[in-house]
Amino acid sequence: MGRGLFISFMKTKLAIYQAFTRTFGNRILTRKEYGTITENGVGKMNDLDRTVLQQIQGLGITHVWYTGVIRHATCTDYSLFGIPQQNPHVVKGRAGSPYAITDYYDIDPDIATNVDKRMEEFENLVFRTHAEGLKVLIDFVPNHVARQYKSIAKPEGVEDLGQGDDTGKHFDMQNNFYYCPGEYLDLSGVPTYDYATG
């Protein structure tokens, strides 16, 4: 970036609007503890339509920060779409943490109207946002992933995190994860939860 462009950029006042995508457009007011996505609802990327974005831009906002866009661990079953199911014992609640990334190359299916077209919906969200004169920010968390990270959308030739790890070592600089060799997670004393009946 040239000095003149940098100085011009620094004189521009930034105003960032954060939209936690899965809650932003949610119109279901039920707040059932440990409720399913059907019971408690979820916002969708399509809820951030041109009208909403025009209202945000009208506030003097320059950037919209979309939180929770990258696919992360949840208890919602999307295995019919080829998305690996997560162990509920390692998911924060049912909706999960948007920072427990399960695939850096994919979009969270919860916030898509059509799961099969979630990337297209995200691209359309970016297009709509730019069309209203706003810039887009999303969270990218390079050092915090879900324990069951498994990319289904990675480019050819890219290994999953942990794929080449030496699991026989507690710590190795070349590993993506920490391990407890010879120690196994015993969840036999943890009560099970019937997700079908709640």
Residue ranges and their predicted role:
Residues 69-79, 140-157:
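Aromatic-lined carbohydrate-binding surfaces of glycoside hydrolases
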Residues 11-12, 16, 20, 100-106, ...:
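Alpha-amylase-like alpha-glycosidases and glucanotransferases acting on alpha-linked glucans and related
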Residues 22-28, 33-37, 57-117:
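Aromatic-lined carbohydrate-binding/catalytic grooves of carbohydrate-active enzymes
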Residues 1-9:
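Short, Lys/Arg-enriched N-terminal segments with co-localized hydrophobic residues
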Residues 42-56:
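Short, acidic/polar
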Residues 54-57, 61-65, 104, 111-148:
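Substrate-binding cleft of carbohydrate-active enzyme catalytic domains
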Residues 9, 14, 25-26, 135:
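Replace the tail clause
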